[in-house]
């Protein structure tokens, strides 16, 4: 049994303590003598049935969980715990009322009933075989009434000890030994009472089996039968004293076991089987011992047992208190540990949160720091960029200022060069001044300036001949102290040399006139005067190579030291290649002037004066310190002129100056002198006398001119006033009318008058217009129109020509209609018709063909071969709103045409018109296909 408890302790958890229910008596008890036999029989049956039922239920309850045990036990107790009444008696009545009164001192029956599940009983019954003989002996020999109170107290202490033994670590071996002692005592007692109770057991066995274990309510029955012990087993008395400590009927007192059942329980365990076999072998000895001896020993040891029992009770109480204190201490420690664990958990959580917050703060601070550093870096970078930008802008501004200054200087130099180029022909060339040379090696004399036409005299004027030098050497070798050199000097006559003359080579170079005798036409200046031409060129330089003369000589650079530097002659710190800048192309002065200069150029070409490219005059060879750029501009202009002349293929010849000396009157008859006189006569000065007649003629001419203008204006008023066309159309129409003789008065007036002067602003006329033909010039008509009328917009009509009111009044032409009603004889542009509008009374346009015989080919109007767009004329007419339509300059430009008549293979005309740039028209080239057959040559 003890071994079983050791095995079940690990499986079944500790149970809570339940107060034991003490046995009670019925109010109407049945006599004990009547039911002794029935009790013995029922007890035997109960043990067998309990054993069988416990074996079946043990397998199910072992696997049940601890939570479902109490529920199952409570369910079973509610349903099946109601025992069947036999003759109005329950199962407890059979145990309380016993008929064995003779052996009351020897047998002690203990009944313990606790309200608990029968799981513990099922576990115990699996290991116990119920002995019906032992149980019947216990019932017959038991004495219940005498020791009921004592046994109940003992039973309660045993139950408490059993509960304590489940929670404490009692060795399984001690419990097993105690169980073996208890088995021996029970077996001896069962042997004494076997014969007496055999019949009662058989009678009541069936009833006890049905009553006791019905509903699985176990009752524990213990019998202390130490009196039946034999003398041979007296050595086991020590173990009997502790039998009450180890015997356990049930976990809470719900099972019923006898001493024989405990013996069978201990025998069924593996540890107690050998001991049980030995006891069985010795059981006949125990049965054969007298009962009186056993009872005497039991009486003797009862006092000792009582003391031991009290001592054990005290120990158990102390142990219970100690266990209770330990349990409370454990609970308190557990609570403290739990509280400490909770605190540690809270602290860990708090610490973790603090660490997390700290990390978050550090991360935020780090991020803010990085952002600040980044912002600082960006600010520094932006400041640096701004500084660089400002420095770059300052540098660019400085560079721009320098370029502006340089451009202004170059512009000023260019203007000065142009002025100098123009005025160079009217100024006398300056003679180059000789460089200032200071003579500082003249002994006691102070340094002085060597002026022009001056040279230094030689230090020694005496010419040392070889004979004199030999004599000097001889005298030096044969020196005599007696001979005095001073005496020789006094006796010697002084030597003489010629005067010092200025080098004549400078005169030939700097002379203004060079007489060339028998010079060829294509001769080139002599190179001996200027030195050899040299080319200084380096492949790694951007600066153009130098091709010219280099007459400077150095005393520092020699063949033995070619890498030495001559700082006096050259400046090694300045890199001329870096200072080189590509110059802009200069303006060509050859075509800057008007067409009037072309005639002058043709006349200048006849002079035969030409300077070849690369030729340096006397004044050009000298570098001016004040204006070094002027010479470059001149050279560029001369180079361009040279290229232009070479392109034209003009002949080059060297100028031959002529010197004519004085001519005497006596030598006039000489043929050579007469030729010179003819040359000089063209430059003869003439005395001119001013006369009054010329002024009067000029006044008369002006008066005639004004009168003629008035006559022309009188005939022009009907055509001019209210005309929407331009001045060009009006002038063309008026001239055509004059050619056809429509204005007889004007023609007659022009015939008797002088020729009208041509305006200086007019260029070549389109047709040869003059007084011989009776047609006024275009410039004259244009001047008259501009002086007496204006092209503007008025309420009467839109844009047209309006003659001044005073002019109309002076000619009595105030009634002229607006627009004009003129019958045109020439072709008028369509824009004029549209501008004029369809006014009733206007005659249709009449296009009278002009005979080719009356006009030369050069006098034909080029506009006949052109078709100007209608929109262009309308745009021109609308743009002149509020302003004078045409000016003299505009009309002159319009009429400035170059008509080139070239004979072709097909005998056709090729007409080219060059329109001025001011009107924005393009040149029109007409093929022969656009010329009518009548105009062919």
Swiss-Prot record:
Motif (PxVxL motif): 213-226
Regions of compositional bias (Basic and acidic residues) in chain numbering: 31-43, 301-386
UniProt keyword Mitochondrion present: no
Mutant lacking the gene: phenotype: Cells lacking CHAF1A show delayed S-phase progression with retarded DNA synthesis and defects in a rapid nucleosome formation of newly replicated DNA.
Comp. bias (Low complexity): 255-269
CC annotations in GO: CAF-1 complex; nucleus
Compartment(s): Nucleus
Bias kind Polar residues: ranges: 59-69, 756-766
Keywords from the named record: Cell cycle, Chaperone, Chromatin regulator, DNA damage, DNA repair, DNA replication, Nucleus
Family from the record: Belongs to the CHAF1A family.
Subunit structure: Subunit of the CAF-1 complex that contains RBBP4, CHAF1B and CHAF1A. Interacts with CHAF1B, PCNA and RBBP4.
Domain notes: Contains one Pro-Xaa-Val-Xaa-Leu (PxVxL) motif, which is required for interaction with chromoshadow domains.
Protein's recorded name: Chromatin assembly factor 1 subunit A
Species annotation: Gallus gallus (Chicken)
């Amino acid at each position: 049994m003890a071994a079983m408890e050791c095995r079940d302790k690990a499986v079944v958890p500790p149970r809570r303590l339940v107060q034991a229910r003490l046995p009670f008596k019925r109010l109407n008890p049945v006599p004990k003598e009547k039911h002794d036999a029935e009790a013995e029989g029922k007890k035997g049956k109960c043990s067998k049935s309990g054993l069988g039922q416990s074996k079946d239920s043990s397998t199910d309850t072992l696997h049940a969980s601890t939570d479902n045990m109490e529920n199952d036990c409570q369910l079973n107790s509610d349903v099946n715990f109601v025992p069947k009444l036999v003759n109005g008696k329950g199962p407890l009545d059979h145990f309380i009322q016993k008929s064995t009164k003779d052996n009351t001192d020897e047998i002690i029956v203990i009944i313990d009933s606790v309200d608990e599940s029968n799981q513990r009983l099922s576990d115990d019954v699996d290991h116990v075989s119920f002995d019906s003989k032992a149980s019947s002996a216990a019932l017959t020999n038991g004495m219940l009434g005498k020791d009921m109170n004592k046994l109940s107290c003992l039973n309660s202490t045993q139950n408490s000890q059993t509960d304590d033994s489940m929670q404490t670590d009692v060795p399984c071996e001690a419990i097993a030994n105690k169980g073996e002692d208890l088995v021996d005592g029970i077996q001896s007692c069962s042997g004494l009472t076997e014969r007496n109770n055999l019949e009662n057991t058989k009678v009541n066995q069936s009833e006890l089996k049905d009553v006791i274990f019905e509903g699985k309510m176990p009752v524990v029955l213990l019998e202390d039968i130490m009196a039946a012990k034999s003398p041979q087993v007296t050595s086991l008395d020590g173990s009997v004293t502790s039998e009450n400590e180890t015997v356990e009927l049930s976990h809470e007192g719900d099972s019923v076991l006898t001493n024989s059942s405990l013996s069978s329980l201990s025998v069924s365990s593996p540890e107690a089987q050998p001991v049980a076999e030995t006891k069985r072998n010795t059981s006949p000895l125990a049965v054969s011992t007298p009962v009186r001896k056993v009872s005497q020993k039991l009486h003797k040891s009862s006092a000792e047992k009582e003391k031991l029992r009290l001592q054990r009770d005290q120990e158990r109480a102390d142990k219970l208190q100690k266990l209770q204190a330990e349990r409370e201490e454990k609970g308190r420690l557990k609570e403290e540990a739990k509280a400490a664990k909770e605190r540690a958990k809270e602290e860990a959580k708090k610490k973790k949160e603090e660490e997390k917050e700290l990390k978050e703060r550090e991360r935020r601070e780090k991020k803010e720091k990085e952002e600040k550093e980044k912002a600082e870096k960006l600010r520094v970078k932006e400041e640096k960029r701004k500084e660089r930008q400002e420095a770059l802008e300052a540098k660019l501004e400085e560079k721009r200022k320098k370029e502006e200054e340089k451009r202004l200087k170059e512009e000023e130099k260019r203007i000065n060069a142009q002025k100098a180029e123009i005025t160079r022909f009217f100024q006398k060339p300056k003679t180059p001044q000789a460089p200032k040379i200071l003579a500082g090696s003249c002994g006691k004399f102070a340094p002085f300036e060597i002026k022009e036409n001056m040279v230094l005299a030689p230090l020694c004027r005496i010419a040392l001949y070889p004979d004199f030098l030999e004599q000097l050497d001889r005298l030096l070798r044969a020196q005599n102290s007696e001979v005095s050199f001073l005496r020789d000097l006094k006796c010697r006559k002084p030597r003489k040399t010629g005067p010092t003359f200025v080098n004549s080579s400078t005169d030939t170079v700097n002379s203004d006139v060079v007489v060339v005798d028998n010079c060829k036409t294509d001769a080139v200046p002599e190179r001996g005067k200027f030195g050899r031409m040299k080319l200084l060129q380096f492949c790694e330089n951007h600066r153009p190579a130098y091709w010219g003369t280099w007459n400077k000589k150095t005393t520092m650079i020699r063949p033995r030291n070619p890498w030495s530097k001559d700082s006096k002659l050259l400046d090694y710190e300045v890199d001329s290649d870096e200072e080189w800048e590509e110059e802009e192309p200069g303006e060509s002065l050859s075509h800057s002037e008007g067409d009037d200069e072309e005639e002058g150029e043709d006349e200048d070409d006849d002079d035969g004066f030409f300077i070849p490219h690369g030729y340096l005059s006397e004044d050009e060879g000298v570098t001016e310190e004040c204006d070094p750029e002027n010479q470059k501009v001149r050279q560029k202009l001369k180079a361009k002129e040279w290229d232009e002349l070479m392109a034209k293929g003009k002949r080059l010849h060297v100028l031959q100056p002529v010197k004519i000396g004085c001519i005497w009157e006596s030598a006039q008859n000489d043929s050579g002198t007469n030729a010179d006189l003819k040359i000089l006569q063209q430059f003869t000065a003439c005395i001119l006398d001013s006369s009054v007649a010329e002024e009067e003629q000029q006044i008369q001419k002006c008066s005639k001119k004004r009168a003629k203008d008035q006559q022309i204006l009188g005939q022009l008023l009907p055509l001019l006033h209210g005309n929407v066309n331009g001045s060009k159309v009006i002038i063309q129409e008026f001239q055509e009318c004059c050619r056809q003789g429509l204005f007889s008065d004007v023609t007659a007036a022009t015939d008797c008058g002088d020729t009208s002067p041509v305006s200086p602003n007019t260029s070549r006329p389109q047709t040869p217009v003059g007084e011989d033909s009776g047609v006024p010039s275009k410039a004259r008509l244009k001047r008259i129109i501009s002086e007496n009328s204006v092209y503007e917009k008025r309420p009467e009509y839109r844009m047209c020509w309006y003659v001044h009111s005073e002019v109309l009044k002076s000619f009595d032409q105030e009634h002229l209609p607006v627009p004009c009603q003129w019958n045109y004889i020439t072709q008028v542009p369509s824009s004029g018709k549209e501008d004029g509008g369809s006014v009733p009374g206007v005659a249709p346009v009449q296009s009278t063909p002009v005979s080719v015989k009356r006009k030369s080919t050069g006098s034909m109007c080029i506009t006949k071969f052109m078709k100007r767009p209608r929109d262009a004329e309308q745009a021109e007419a609308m743009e002149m709103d509020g302003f004078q339509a045409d000016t003299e300059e505009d009309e002159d430009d319009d009429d400035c045409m170059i008509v080139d008549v070239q004979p072709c293979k097909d005998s056709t005309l090729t007409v080219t018109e060059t329109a001025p740039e001011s009107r924005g028209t393009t040149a029109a080239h007409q093929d022969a296909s656009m010329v009518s057959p009548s105009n062919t040559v």
